[in-house]
Regions:
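Terminal amphipathic alpha-helical/low-complexity segments used for targeting or macromolecular assembly
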Residues: 1-53
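N-terminal signal-anchor transmembrane helix
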Residues: 56-58
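Flexible, glycine/small-residue-enriched loop-and-beta-strand segment within the central core
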Residues: 38-45, 65-75, 80-131
Length: 131
């Protein structure tokens, strides 16, 4: 196996959204989602929709949830996202109806090809079917 050469890493092909949108989401995520003092799920659901997420009815989002890009997220009706969940959705994540993503779960859409010296980014969507 060849050594990794981080200086040769290139993910210029990966475009998860505009820089301004990502920056705005960063602050909204910190203030309303990662903040343990905001227990109000309804506000979080509205903010997710505002940023392009498709969110069904009766969705409950607990405190300290980290979502990378809401515009790449779909949550079905009556699903729950538990405390300390990290949705690192570099590409589309689809969560079905009546699904519970329990406390501390991590949904990771990306990794790196450690077998290549260029450490290429690998991304694949996640689909969690109806509960």
């Amino acid at each position: 196996m060849k050594s990794v050469s981080i200086k040769d890493y290139d993910n210029s092909w990966y475009r998860p959204g505009g820089a301004v949108k990502r920056l705005l989401w960063y602050f909204v995520n910190v203030l309303f989602f990662l903040n343990p003092f905001n227990p109000f799920s309804g506000i979080k659901v509205r903010l997710l929709r505002l940023f392009g997420a498709q969110v069904g009815v009766g969705v409950n989002i607990k405190p300290n949830v980290n979502i990378k890009y809401p515009w790449l997220l779909e949550i079905g009706d009556y699903s729950w996202i538990g405390e300390n969940v990290w949705i690192d959705n570099l590409v589309q994540v689809t969560i079905g109806t009546n699904v519970c993503i329990s406390q501390g779960a991590m949904l990771l859409c990306g990794n790196h090809n450690y077998k290549l010296p260029t450490f290429d980014l690998i991304v694949k969507p996640i689909i969690i079917e109806n509960g």
